[in-house]
A protein has these predicted regions:
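N-terminal pre-domain/capping segments
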Residues: 1-98, 171, 199, 257-282
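Histidine-acidic metal/acid-base catalytic patches
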Residues: 1-11, 15-26, 156, 160-178, ...
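Active-site-proximal loop/turn and secondary-structure-junction residues that shape catalytic pockets
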Residues: 9-11, 37-39, 65-68, 105-109, ...
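Short acidic/His/Gly/Ser-rich catalytic and metal-binding motifs that mark active-site loops
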Residues: 15, 61, 68-70, 103, ...
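Conserved beta-strand positions in the central sheet of alpha/beta enzyme cores
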Residues: 34, 61-63, 102, 144, ...
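Catalytic-core regions built around general acid/base machinery
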Residues: 44-56, 128-136, 193-196, 223-228
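Short secondary-structure transition/capping segments
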Residues: 45-48, 72-74, 113-116, 156-158, ...
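Active-site acidic/histidine proton-transfer and metal-coordination neighborhood
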Residues: 54, 76-175, 187, 257-265
Length: 282
């Protein structure tokens, strides 16, 4: 098992000013970090990758899509823009040295139609993702497609329908991830959800119900860790939490009150929680 920290707690773009955070996370005992990719600067990613290599920190990356580059849009030009930007994100992953590109890059974040996904949208989404997966293969990167709760997207909302989507895409570089925050909202049974997608799951976000320190809220952690162990999961456990460090990021993630002492406290306590819970399960 590898334990990591998503850097969105500090910023939506990691630059030299954030290098002390990387130093702290290495000292704390993390195996790696998750890099937000919202601006696709290959040179900057290469420099960051060098810093991470120096520290001995592994890395994954996360990105999203918006309305103007929605891979399930009825407009072919918009879909093509989404595919192109996802490919740019993969180029950045290659420069960064990231093995996984995670996130809800299957559709536009926060955009709704007033209904669930149509047959056309599912077809467009699969075609778009298959094209991205082809590029991922050339970059040596695996896609970890993330489903979100119904308040953030309408395309993929459960482990079961995401697993079906992955099977429709049918590409070895297209897999999925499981996020405890979204599952806590959408799934009727956590164990059944994890089992339903275990064949395709390559990444896990450890995220509390209020997006603060894992282990301090009401996510069903015992069932989560028990079932991950039962299904033989051995990939990343990546903490995803959000705070007030950047006003624009706080607004996007609907955070307006402080729910932890400090970012460092959250990171250290989260790592201790994950390690202790996993150790209990042999």
């Amino acid at each position: 098992m590898k334990f990591g920290m998503n850097l969105l707690l500090w910023s939506g773009g990691i630059e030299e000013e954030h290098y002390p955070v990387l130093d702290m996370l290495k000292e704390a005992g993390f195996d790696g970090v998750e890099i937000p990719l919202f601006a696709y600067d290959v040179g900057q990613c290469a420099a960051l990758g060098k810093k991470l290599d120096e520290l001995g920190l592994e890395r994954t990356a996360v990105t999203v899509r918006n309305e103007e580059d929605n891979p399930i849009s009825p407009d072919e030009t918009v879909r093509a823009a989404g595919v192109d930007l996802n490919k740019q994100a993969l180029d950045c992953c290659q420069a960064l040295g990231a093995d996984f590109l995670c996130g809800p890059f299957h559709s536009a974040l926060g955009i709704f139609s007033g209904a669930g996904p149509t047959a056309d949208e599912l077809s467009w989404g699969a075609d778009s993702m298959r094209a991205v997966a082809e590029h991922a293969a050339t970059c040596g990167v695996t896609l970890a497609v993330e489903y979100l709760n119904r308040f953030e997207c309408y395309f993929l909302n459960t482990a079961e329908n995401t697993a079906r989507f992955i099977e429709t895409v049918d590409h070895p570089n297209c897999k999925m991830m499981y996020d405890t925050f979204h599952a806590n909202i959408e799934e009727k049974g956590i164990a059944d959800a994890i089992r339903a997608c275990s064949e395709h799951t390559v990444h896990v976000h450890i995220s509390e119900n209020d997006r603060s320190t894992p282990g301090t809220g009401h996510v069903d952690w015992d069932t989560t860790f028990d079932t991950l162990k039962e299904t033989g999961y051995e990939g990343w456990m990546m903490v995803e939490a959000f705070g007030l460090a950047l006003p624009e990021l706080a607004a996007a993630t609907k955070i307006w009150r402080r729910m932890y002492e400090s970012e460092e406290q959250l990171a250290r306590d989260s790592l201790s929680f994950m390690k202790s819970e996993w150790a209990k399960r042999g």
